[in-house]
């Protein structure tokens, strides 16, 4: 008998009892109710031991932008095991079950926030998103910003925020497509201040969510669509100099704020954030928006030890800018083409790392001409994930 069972709302109390223990937090009655409402969109599986939940995994149906195209993904969350059942392979089996479900439901990609990067690498996930953390002395932002327009504090306006966010998110690979429920449940926290910047034609160019407490200006979300909008928001932050001594914010890894300010020597750290995994390699390759090249022909050898049906040799070919993928259903023998694991394939196709970088580190290998071809085929776009689950 399969010990993995899909759980229902009747199991919510036991589900969140395990979550609170495993992740060491305590929910009030109101917070528990909110968690249960959020869980209504989840598919939750439990590894059952005599009708009790020994381990569990949540899967959230989401979609993201990759090179301007929308991809359905499965977000893995709240993976937990009671201590007396740990190290029995329950999480491994739950992950395998979730990957099979995702493939059957057209979710060709999966995200998760790891408690341990090495643990999830064993099952095919790879770091695909970094965060750059800034701690900026307020004094560093007090300069003439040369802006046109204004910033206005605002109450919640999901329609406006969503319009701005969507245009911003499409500039990156892997950013979430948010629906109204996600905005309400996951983004718009109670007590957060909000402001929108407008150009001199009264067109919205960005927004900021923030808190000011204990002499610190904490940016919760910082979104802009133009250089003018960026500067308007920076000037808005600087105008809080009587209330805060420093500013904390998280930005994309390629953020260029240090080039804009007179004194760029402030604390900047880059930290690995979310991991990703291609669930269905042949399907993902077939729908991935490669760059259009006049003529291309190459072989891609993929190894996936956890989902063996992904392993094989794929022919990437194209004429007149149309790229096609053929699954040759062969093993990984032969030296021609490029050889990689599913982890590094995910890293490359999301744009987190370039093929040339990985080849230099011997994380992928192949003949020089093939590496050069795949380098040209994969669009260059920064990865960024502003959400959490």
What are these regions (language model features)?
Residues 1-61, 68-75, 141-180, 213-217:
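Short amphipathic alpha-helix that is part of the acyltransferase structural core
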Residues 35-41, 186-190, 347-349:
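Short loop/turn motifs at secondary-structure junctions and domain boundaries
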Residues 85-97, 228-232:
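Conserved acetyl-CoA pyrophosphate-binding loop and the N-cap/start of the following alpha-helix
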Residues 95, 100-114, 242-252:
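Conserved GNAT acetyl-CoA-binding A-motif
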Residues 120, 125:
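Conserved active-site tyrosine of GNAT-family acetyltransferases
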Residues 126-143, 221-228, 235-337, 342-344, ...:
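Active-site/acyl-donor-binding loops of N-acyltransferases
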Residues 131-220, 224-240, 282-294, 298:
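Amide-forming acyltransferase catalytic core, primarily the GNAT-like/NAT-type
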């Amino acid at each position: 008998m399969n010990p993995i069972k899909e759980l229902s709302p009747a199991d919510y109390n036991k589900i969140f009892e395990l979550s609170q223990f495993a992740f060491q937090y305590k929910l009030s009655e109101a917070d528990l109710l909110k968690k249960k409402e959020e869980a209504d969109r989840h598919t939750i599986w439990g590894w059952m031991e005599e009708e009790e939940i020994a381990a569990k995994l949540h899967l959230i149906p989401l979609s993201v932008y990759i090179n301007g195209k929308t991809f359905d993904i499965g977000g893995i969350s709240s993976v937990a095991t009671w201590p007396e059942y740990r190290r029995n392979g329950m999480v491994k089996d739950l992950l395998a079950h979730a990957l099979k479900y995702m493939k059957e439901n057209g979710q060709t990609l999966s995200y998760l926030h790891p408690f341990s990067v090495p643990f999830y690498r064993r099952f095919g996930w790879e770091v695909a998103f970094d965060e750059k953390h800034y701690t900026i002395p307020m004094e560093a932002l007090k300069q003439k910003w040369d802006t046109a327009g204004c910033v206005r504090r605002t109450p919640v306006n999901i329609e406006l925020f969503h319009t701005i966010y969507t245009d911003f998110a499409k500039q990156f690979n892997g950013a979430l497509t948010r629906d109204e429920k996600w905005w309400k449940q996951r983004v718009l926290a109670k007590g957060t201040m909000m402001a929108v910047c407008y150009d001199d034609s009264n067109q919205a160019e960005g927004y900021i969510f923030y808190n000011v407490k204990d002499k610190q200006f904490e940016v919760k979300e910082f979104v802009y669509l133009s250089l003018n909008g960026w500067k308007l928001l920076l000037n808005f932050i600087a105008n809080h100099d009587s209330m805060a001594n420093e500013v904390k914010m998280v930005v994309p890894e390629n953020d260029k704020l240090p080039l804009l300010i007179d004194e760029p020597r402030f604390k900047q750290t880059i930290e690995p954030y979310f991991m990703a995994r291609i669930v269905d390699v042949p399907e993902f390759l077939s729908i991935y928006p490669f760059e259009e090249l006049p003529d291309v022909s190459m072989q891609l050898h993929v190894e996936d030890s956890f989902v063996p049906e992904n392993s094989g040799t794929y022919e990437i070919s194209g004429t007149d800018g149309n790229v096609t993928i053929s699954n040759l259903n062969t093993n990984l023998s032969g030296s021609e083409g490029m050889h990689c694991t599913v982890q590094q394939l995910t890293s490359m196709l999301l744009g987190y790392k370039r093929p040339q970088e990985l080849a230099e580190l011997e994380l992928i290998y192949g003949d020089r001409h093939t590496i050069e071809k795949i380098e040209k085929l994969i669009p260059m776009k920064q990865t960024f994930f502003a959400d959490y689950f």
